[in-house]
Amino acid sequence: MGATGLGFLLSWRQDNLNGTDCQGCNILYFSETTGSMCSELSLNRGLEARRKKDLKDSFLWRYGKVGCISLPLREMTAWINPPQISEIFQGYHQRVHGADALSLQTNSLRSRLSSQCLGQSFLLRTLERGRGFRALGDICGHVHEED
């Protein structure tokens, strides 16, 4: 099943394994037909090399190339709400298939996110159905969904 919508989550996490600070980016795909998230991409600085390969092997080839977002920890200090996300991250409103258009969006997002971040969670909504998901990132980079 192809992805019919996109959202994303930047989060700060404490790496309990080695006690160092780390940051992550989750790019969330959700399906309009099932009304739920169908796959998830998570890159964690501390586990980047291993997880990149794991994620590529598991699903990236199905959806196309996905751009990564990496921000210095000092810039991750404030919330961005969904209306601001829609202005910054235009792909969120374009029903992007395969995430092929994300590379340019990522560069734009990186430059416009100065001194801002999403924190641990934010609400993702599908436009057509109005269904909402709260995505919570844990230290392992997994994403859990709630109604």
Swiss-Prot record:
Q: Summarize tissue expression.
A: Expressed in testis. Detected in spermatocytes, spermatids and spermatozoa (at protein level).
Recorded superkingdom: Eukaryota
Which protein, by its recorded name, is this?
Answer: PTPN13-like protein, Y-linked
The encoding gene is: PRY
